[in-house]
Each structure stands twice: as C-alpha cells, then as structure tokens.
Design a protein with these regions (language model features):
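PP2C/PPM-type serine/threonine phosphatase catalytic domain
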Residues: 1-128
Length: 128
C-alpha cells in the first residue's frame, strides 16, 4: 500500500518508511524489520539489539570499511538501504527470540536511538 500510494500520488513519490513488528506467542517472539527501526531485548539488566539496521553506515561497519568511532560522525548515517514503499517488493528480516520470565521488549525508531546511548535506555528501563 505504501508503494502504491507513492506511485499514484506525486506528493508521496519516493516516499518510504521503516518498520519493526513483533508477535509474542507463549515463550517466543517473532520479529520482523525493514530499515533502521529496532527491536531490543532487555534481560538481566542488559539491552541486546535483536534486529540488524539496514543502513549504509551499518553496511560499512559490517564490512570493516569504517570503525565505530568513524560511524559516530559519518555524514550519511541517515541513509537506509531497505525501506517499505520505494520498491514494489522488499526483503524482510525475520528473527525468532526465545523469551524467559522477566524479559522486556523495546521497539523503537532511530528517533530514540539517535538521541540516547544504550546505557541511557537501560537507566530509563530500570527506573520503571
């Protein structure tokens, strides 16, 4: 639908969006993502990113082209490599996460993760 709207409405041409989705059933979470919206698992006071960012900066980090330090100030760190709406099909990453009692799931956009370090997010979770 996002792609169709982009094709049919000139104001929305080349419009795209990222998504993270999660279905929890019993002790399992099935997670899907496209783009740089993330899902984290908080367990035993540790925050673990489950999804993989579909972004230029993450691709360059993974290939060893740039370092973590270089990624912080990378000029094109907002460039995503996968999104909904730009093409008529998209590859979606799917993850299965086994859950245990006390686990928390955090789904968020880069609006959160571009402003807060993981340690800050953990502090906020601990406060609640």
């Amino acid at each position: 639908e996002v792609y169709k709207d982009s094709e049919n409405n000139t104001e929305h041409r080349n419009m795209g969006t990222t998504i993270v989705a999660c279905l929890v059933h019993d002790d399992n979470a099935i997670v899907a993502n496209v783009g740089d919206s993330r899902l984290y698992l908080y367990r035993d006071e540790e925050l673990k990113q489950i999804t993989v960012d579909h972004s230029l900066v993450n691709d360059l980090l993974s290939s060893g082209t740039i370092t973590e330090e270089e990624a912080v100030d990378f000029a094109q760190k907002n460039v995503i490599t996968r999104s909904l709406g730009i093409q008529d099909t998209v590859d979606v990453d799917i993850f299965n996460v086994e859950l245990v009692k006390g686990d928390l799931i955090l789904m968020c956009t880069d609006g959160l993760t571009s402003q807060l370090e993981n340690e800050d997010i953990v502090d906020i979770i601990k406060a609640y």
